[in-house]
Amino acid sequence: MQKRDDAFSITINDPDLIDESAIIVMETINDALLLIFKENSIYRLLTADSTDPQKTQPDTGHTYEKIATIGAASPYVARIFLQFKRIIDQVFPEDSIKPKLLEQVWSLNEQLLVCAQFESNIREQLDDVMQKCDTIIEQNKSSRAIPPLAKVKNLESDAKSFLLVGKQFLIDCFKLISLFTDLPLGARDEAHFDKHIKWLQQNRPTLKKLSSALGNDLFWIRRLSECRNAIEHPGPGQSLTIENTKLHPGNKFSLPTWSYDLTNKINVKESSIPIHQELDAYLNNMLYLLEEILLFCISESLPADGMFSIYQHNEADIKPNCPIKYYASLSAKFYSRLKPS
């Protein structure tokens, strides 16, 4: 019988998820967390020692648990943790902010994946709901009474949960910036995003591109944040309502929408916005926001000797099963120093 400390190989056989895609890579975070990235899912490896640290049962086996049904083939995974884990390992020494940085990047990626799952829960029901609504209306259009339309299940829970996790993601993005810049963040003002951007403009002029990018993103950042606040603290000028499928004049129907009035804090008031479209837009914005923060902050933190630079892969070199876009390598300037004179 194989001993628990022997080298071993592992095959993922998850009874709850039929995912025959390949294991793309396994990554560790500070020797405390081992992650298995398949094309379409992510697992956490639980070694025998983590299950039985006192080694009281020598036959204790290794196991694993599912983290996400989104894997390395998704930009939400490849373009965040997998991309920047390689860059961070290459350019940061162990006695730097590296351990904390890796923890924060993975935590943010987990939040992004949670939001992606909430969005997917809604979006993946839409085709079926539309077909059912069309059938109900078609079969009953000659009648004066149309039965209730098909609904998106768990709509309100998933939509509101997206906003709750989404706002925390935004706060944690600025905590990530603080790790690089010492941006002051208090418990009472951690969501004062405009204040944080102003501080960066005044105190970190070398990060001008980051401040500019954050300023351009401020509108949607505050809108998401205030939509979340409208859930927790509703009132005049701070409200959000969610509506599932709805019948309209002429026997037409609409997919789920939400309406919000955020005029108590920002000049935003919208009606009947398709929820799935706005969540998709938020997800993409969140991906690009986090990627930009990491690119700008890491670029500013590269060794002063100019040894490394960050480059972008040619489109043809980006792999569909793990579409990493950026990488770190020796800079052209450093290469020139290596050439014999």
What are the roles of these predicted feature ranges?
Residues 122-136:
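A glycine-rich, hydrophobic loop/mini-helix early in the fold
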